[in-house]
Curated annotation (Swiss-Prot):
The lineage of its organism: Eukaryota, Viridiplantae, Chlorophyta, Ulvophyceae, TCBD clade. Keywords: Hydrogen ion transport, Ion transport, Transport. PROSITE patterns: ATPASE_ALPHA_BETA. One of its GO terms (cellular component) is proton-transporting V-type ATPase, V1 domain. The keyword Nucleus does not apply. SUPFAM superfamilies: P-loop containing nucleoside triphosphate hydrolases. V-ATPase is a heteromultimeric enzyme composed of a peripheral catalytic V1 complex (main components: subunits A, B, C, D, E, and F) attached to an integral membrane V0 proton pore complex (main component: the proteolipid protein). GO terms for molecular function: ATP binding; proton-transporting ATPase activity, rotational mechanism. One of its GO terms (biological process) is vacuolar acidification. This is V-type proton ATPase subunit B 1. Gene3D superfamilies: 3.40.50.12240. Belongs to the ATPase alpha/beta chains family. PANTHER family: V-TYPE PROTON ATPASE SUBUNIT B.
Amino acid sequence: MASADVFKANVEAVTRDYICEPRIEYRTVGGVSGPLVVVELVKRPKFAEIVNIRLGNGTSRRGQVLEVDGNRAVVQVFEGTSGIDNRNTTLQFTGEVLSTPVSKDMLGRVFNGSGKPIDGGPPVLAEAYLDIQGSSINPSERTYPEEMIQTGVSTIDVMNSIARGQKIPLFSAAGLPHNDIAAQICRQAGLVKRGNQDSMIDAGHEEEEFAIVFAAMGVNMETAHYFKQDFEENGSMEKTVLFLNLANDPTIERIITPRIALTTAEYLAYECGKHVLVILTDMSSYADALREVSAAREEVPGRRGYPGYMYTDLATIYERAGRIEGRKGSITQLPILTMPNDDITHPIPDLTGYITEGQIYVDRQLHNRQIYPPINVLPSLSRLMKSAIGEGMTRKDHSEVSNQLYANYAIGKDVAAMKAVVGEEALSSEDLLYLEFLDKFERKFVNQGHYEARTIFDSLDLAWTLLRLFPKELLRRITAKTLEKMYERSES
């Protein structure tokens, strides 16, 4: 009798971890609307759980529960609803949230918008599976963004410096070279370490500390090929994770692409200790996908047809930037969005500006005059610039030089407008100085080559070259002590 009890106990011990309740397969599709499928008679559906969908032809798709009403569930299908019917389609509710495999080996790889490899390489050997919505971060554990990320672009580094952990968007428009700017920043971006100027080094090549996560949403094949080829040819692919959602991919996939990218960035930053720059392009495509889902759910539309919760939804993406106390890494976000009809009051840039910490403005007039990158510094702003620059981080004179460039450029713009009314003959000699500065600033400082990487010190020295056009008396934003040290005006 005792041996029978032992045998029974052994059988239970061996089998108890392997016995599970089988998942129910549902064939109760009640309707299809755009990217959404309505499933009836579901036993205890859960909000945000993943649904495995098998079509009549044997292909598999994934979806996520968007809405629950009793035993009725609304599922958004990531790969699109084409081919789904109410006879042959079966659905399994997994009870799990959408997670993505993450690993340090993802660096140098190319994935589609759902996180599946498309570069011909093997699947990712996951070190962890993380919820794509991200982990909750205790606000009191966040640290203030400090220290600068060097982009190699003078107008950004000198006048709109980006701090590690900051979120700052690039406001562009159709036909402007925002993709070129994004690729150039990926090539050139690196860290600037603390210390004095003599001991400070450009850490752009310290790839073990710096990484880039690039997510493209709704791009065409030509643009996707451009990014892949550019990263591979310039060696930046080794430190980059690339996610590509193409224009012919399902629109609904754009909802999860930035979240998968940010989940990967969080792992690299907080678990691997890397300083990660996340570039998301184009957030307008993401917002349009959000509007499509909202329309399919027949929700009450907000401004221009976008859902009323778009502000909250965008915040769930942008607010995942930052630094955490006790963790070495950081996440800096540079989302790119195209303003419809060049309208900065459009809901997408308008709401983005409320959430983020500044903006970098790409200007069509500068682009039409063959100036690259066509970044207009006057409407541009970096709210955290003051914490990223100065002695020990960049250079002591950085803030004063930036302020003086802004002041002189603004005055130069006013003088140019006045010249159009009264003519050049009516201008004073001082006005002519500002006009000369305006032209040289745009042609020498703003304008730079696609493959011209300027260090922050190169850019500051170039700024001083332009400021020396003026006598010391006109450089009112710079202290006498700094002028005495840095101002060496040529007498020739």
